[in-house]
From Swiss-Prot:
Contributes to the overall PI4-kinase activity of the cell. This contribution may be especially significant in plasma membrane, endosomal and Golgi compartments. The phosphorylation of phosphatidylinositol (PI) to PI4P is the first committed step in the generation of phosphatidylinositol 4,5-bisphosphate (PIP2), a precursor of the second messenger inositol 1,4,5-trisphosphate (InsP3). The keyword Disulfide bond does not apply. Residues 340-360 are annotated as: Activation loop. Residues 18-34 have a biased composition (Low complexity). It catalyses: a 1,2-diacyl-sn-glycero-3-phospho-(1D-myo-inositol) + ATP = a 1,2-diacyl-sn-glycero-3-phospho-(1D-myo-inositol 4-phosphate) + ADP + H(+). Residues 299-307 are annotated as: Catalytic loop. Belongs to the PI3/PI4-kinase family. Type II PI4K subfamily. Pfam families: PI3_PI4_kinase. This is Phosphatidylinositol 4-kinase type 2-beta. Its EC number is 2.7.1.67. Residues 151-153 are annotated as: Important for substrate binding. The gene is PI4K2B. Residues 1-10, 42-62 have a biased composition (Acidic residues).
Amino acid sequence: MESGSEEPDEQLLLLSEPALHAGPPAGRAAPGGAVRLRGEPGLEEEEEGEEDSGPEGDGEEEPLLRASGRGRRAGAARDKEPRVGAGHTGHAIDMNTFLDDPEFAEIITRAEQVIECGVLPERISQGSSGSYFVKDCKGKTIGVFKPKSEEPYGHLNPKWTKYFHKICCPCCFGRGCLVPNQGYLSEAGAYLVDDKLGLGVVPKTKVVWLVSETFNYSAIDRAKSRGKKYALEKVPKVAKKFNRIGLPPKVGSFQLFVEGYKEADYWLRKFETDPLPENTRKEFQSQFERLVILDYVIRNTDRGNDNWLVRYEKQDDGLNLSDKDIQWTVTEESTIKIAAIDNGLAFPFKHPDEWRAYPFHWAWLSQAQVPFSQETRDLVLPRISDMNFVQDLCEDLHELFKTDKGFDKATFENQMSVMRGQILNLTQALKDGKSPIQLVQMPRVIVERSSTGSQGRIVHLSNAFTQTFHSRKPFFSSW
């Protein structure tokens, strides 16, 4: 195992004062989550306490590149954890209000209504955590809900895989670079980053509260629910004093379901025997580059070729489509689209430097050897080369992550230091015309904000950032 032990030669660079501008419209919801409406005091969902860990890093330090003078919007609506009003039957309608996205709000409202009508979410058999297909009144899947308490290391995870992992192999339990039990925020944060960068590869994902009999609750919660419902029937006057009737709502990520997609592994094998037309190949390469940028910026530690999806609508060229194994859609013009799902193991507070490197599995594909296209560079480079844009992105993530009751500001700053370092590397790679494989081989960097720097969306004169090369490598490293 390699370890950097040199004392860093640190230099700070004061960034120029950018121009101010007007703030956002009033009533803007916190990005990636619902506006929390406070009701009568009541019971909240019981969650397992989370451990906060500090960062590790060593190596040489250099001053960060200069910032541009453009400013971004300031401020966002602050939200609080919800409480269920007295006499509440257990549904979460009052908790899910999305002022900036009425279309998504309507989808969640319909989901809550059909659950109350008896169309319950269905647990997904795959995976190592409790996740659920949420359906509409016709039984059609409209979204995937992943409760915080049922994440791989959550105390109510209904699957035993991680429990045996913890008991039989505690030394390798969990990922030492990630904040435990924060996957639902990582899912919503990945969509936030995707939306800010204009990538369009992550299905819309936000934090919501839902309640259903099919979710995994403790025996105590279920017993309380039965007792309160019985009291409501027998002694209504007493039951009216209860803070909540029914099971407690669960907080988690809700991702809109995408139709017509299959695992990337399936299509990659198909493309080996049936190559794509040139125009479609270029479109696929462009989509692939957007996936690369997303994963690299959020430092996804769990990206295999089985958890990103491809939808291929093949042009009608007169072929015999009787082969049931070829499940593509026939259109007048071929189109291809990538969907990046399963983003719950991202936003580490340090670069992986213990046992495993958690590589990006797309790095071994032939598409990763092609330099980033001019289209991708024109889309992303103007945004990430502006430090005010990067700071605004960090503030949006802060608004999202702080809604978790286990939020720790110091740990969050470490997460942002890693992300800023990834963005710095990406900026240089796009300027130099590098390929995705060359990008992941660049030295790992963290960019820390000085303790005297002010919090806010605009980089002020008082802000100073330090660039540090992280030289310590994992025991099992791919590059």
